[in-house]
């Protein structure tokens, strides 16, 4: 089982989504305003957790492709 740490960007992107990233994602390195979501076995669970916290969450195209809707 491969567990990774995820965070959600608190600043929505141009489409209104709060992107969820693995903390090791190179596209997350520039994010200064984020909330750690915790450890999950897959990105879908991380995005579901962010949505349960009230975010309009979507997975990062690069590190959370299975949870990326657009």
Task: Enumerate the language-model features and the residues they cover.
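Well-ordered alpha/beta subsegment
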Residues: 45-50
């Amino acid at each position: 089982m491969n567990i990774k740490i995820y965070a959600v960007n608190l600043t929505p992107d141009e489409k209104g989504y709060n992107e969820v990233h693995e903390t090791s994602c190179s596209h997350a390195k520039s994010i200064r305003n984020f909330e750690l979501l915790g450890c999950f076995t897959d990105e879908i669970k991380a995005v579901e957790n962010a949505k349960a916290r009230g975010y309009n969450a979507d997975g990062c195209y690069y590190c959370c492709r299975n949870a990326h809707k657009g």
